[in-house]
């Protein structure tokens, strides 16, 4: 998937078939319009349907934004533990951690790294939604705080890619305190004169939105991404009113001044390159620029 974001999106044909079983690995059915799309064409189009629906990418697929050979991962072994011995009628947290690690091949829901986009160095944090809903627990928060500290020390911008259900309920207060810890680390990044660019992808909710993503210098969202604190159904049940059809979508947030831009996936790498270049050039004219270390990448 390393070339995912370097391919020119292609036009593709789709067949509208209702309630038909889909052979494994041959076709993808769009959850939005119901069209069947040939898998290879769907991948060539960055997993975006012709109707505009953006299918969720894995954390590893998002790493395709980076230049070839620039990815250097941090803290891959850092993992959450079941400190509270959490058990609910639906699941045992310790077993859920084991299953998520087997399913995703990751130790937790966040990958952190250094890398480059069009030759411009940066630090990156990207969530894996398939790992317990991309929820922020103690290991997630620690990984994120560490990569922010690395970015501040190395005078590098930070890009976060966020698809999350929020703080991890199985870790209780241990998860909630990560919100404050991460935002404190971001004050160091700001003091170093470096930007935090947050990309919100579907879905982005709860403590992840309420902490570090909502205070980013630039907030970008993919088209149609659902973004909010509490879910739509919870709000409707609480206020006993129907919400607008497009409530909590990226477009709704843009119209109400909550985010800076809505960017299709095919344009994302170019937009990020432009933003990184603007911030780099602005930083070069500050007095802090003389303290920037000469790096090829951030050391782990």
UniProtKB/Swiss-Prot annotation:
Its EC number is 2.1.3.15. PROSITE patterns: COA_CT_NTER (PS50980). GO terms for molecular function: acetyl-CoA carboxylase activity; ATP binding; carboxyl- or carbamoyltransferase activity; zinc ion binding. Pathway: Lipid metabolism; malonyl-CoA biosynthesis; malonyl-CoA from acetyl-CoA: step 1/1. Zn(2+) binds at residues 30, 33, 49, 51. One of its GO terms (cellular component) is acetyl-CoA carboxylase complex. Binds 1 zinc ion per subunit. Its main location: cytoplasm. It is an enzyme of class 2 (transferase). Component of the acetyl coenzyme A carboxylase (ACC) complex. Biotin carboxylase (BC) catalyzes the carboxylation of biotin on its carrier protein (BCCP) and then the CO(2) group is transferred by the transcarboxylase to acetyl-CoA to form malonyl-CoA. This is Acetyl-coenzyme A carboxylase carboxyl transferase subunit beta 1. It comes from Roseiflexus sp. (strain RS-1).
């Amino acid at each position: 998937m390393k070339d995912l974001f370097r391919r020119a999106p292609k036009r593709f044909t789709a067949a509208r078939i209702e309630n038909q079983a889909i052979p494994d690995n041959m076709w993808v059915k769009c959850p939005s319009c119901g069209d069947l799309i040939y898998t290879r064409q769907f991948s060539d189009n960055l997993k975006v349907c012709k109707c505009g629906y953006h299918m969720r990418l894995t954390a590893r697929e998002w790493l395709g934004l980076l230049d070839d050979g620039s990815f250097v991962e941090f803290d891959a072994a850092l993992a959450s533990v079941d400190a509270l011995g959490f058990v609910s009628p639906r699941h045992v947290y310790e077993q859920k951690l084991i299953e998520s690690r087997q399913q995703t091949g990751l130790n937790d829901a966040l990958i952190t790294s250094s890398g480059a986009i069009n030759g411009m160095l940066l630090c990156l944090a990207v969530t894996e939604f398939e790992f317990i809903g991309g929820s922020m627990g103690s290991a997630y928060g620690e990984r994120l705080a560490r990569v922010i500290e690395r970015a501040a020390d190395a005078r590098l911008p930070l890009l976060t890619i966020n698809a999350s259900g929020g703080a991890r309920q199985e870790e209780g207060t241990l998860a909630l305190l990560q919100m404050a810890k991460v935002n404190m680390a971001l004050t160091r990044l700001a003091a170093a004169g470096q930007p935090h660019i947050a990309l919100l992808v579907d879905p982005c909710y709860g403590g992840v939105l309420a902490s570090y993503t909502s205070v980013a210098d630039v907030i970008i969202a993919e088209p149609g991404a659902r973004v909010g604190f509490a879910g739509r159904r919870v709000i409707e049940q609480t206020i006993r009113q129907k919400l607008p059809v497009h409530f909590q979508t990226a477009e709704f947030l843009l119209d109400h001044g909550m985010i800076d831009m809505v960017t299709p996936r095919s344009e994302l790498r170019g937009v990020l390159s432009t933003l990184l270049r603007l911030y780099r050039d602005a930083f070069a004219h500050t007095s802090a620029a003389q303290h920037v270390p000469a790096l090829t990448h951030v050391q782990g």
